[in-house]
């Protein structure tokens, strides 16, 4: 069964999609500070502001994307659970928000993932599968488990 929210890579992100995501996330993630970057502004000859997403609970910008995806799942998909391949920030963000929403989560990580990342993700409620030597190996295994266990794949960057 295909996921109801599987991204279509041919579609561009629209301002309407951004506004809808902002509405879904309102009050669910921290509103983080923006700071002017003089160095980046000088390097690009443009005014550059940097958003401090490292102030989020898991110290990463990945929280917005992971939570936005989870909030768009159907009740059936939430019950089935989600799976992702990640060796760090996406894993922790997804595990954190999935636990808050009561969604079972499996994270596939490469075998060489630092133990601190594995344990931080496990502490946030995810089932951890260590598979493969590289991220690509872990990613391929996550897709295989998705099919075998009828899970919803949450892509780490799409």
Where are the regions that the model predicts?
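PLP-dependent amino-acid enzyme catalytic core
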Residues: 1-158
């Amino acid at each position: 069964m295909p996921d109801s929210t599987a991204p279509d890579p041919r579609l561009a992100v629209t301002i309407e999609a951004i506004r809808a995501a902002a509405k879904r996330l309102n009050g669910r993630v921290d509103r983080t500070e923006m700071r002017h970057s003089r160095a980046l502004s000088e390097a690009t000859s443009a005014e550059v502001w940097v958003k401090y997403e490292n102030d989020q609970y898991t110290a990463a910008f990945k929280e917005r994307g992971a939570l936005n995806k989870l909030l768009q799942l159907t009740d059936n998909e939430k019950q089935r659970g989600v799976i992702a391949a990640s060796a760090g920030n996406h894993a922790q963000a997804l595990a954190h928000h999935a636990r808050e929403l009561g969604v079972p989560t499996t994270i596939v990580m490469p075998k060489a993932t630092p133990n601190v990342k594995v344990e931080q993700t496990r502490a946030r409620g995810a089932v951890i599968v260590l598979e493969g030597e590289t991220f690509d190996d872990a990613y391929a295994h996550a897709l295989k488990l998705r099919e075998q266990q009828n899970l919803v794949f949450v892509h780490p960057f799409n």
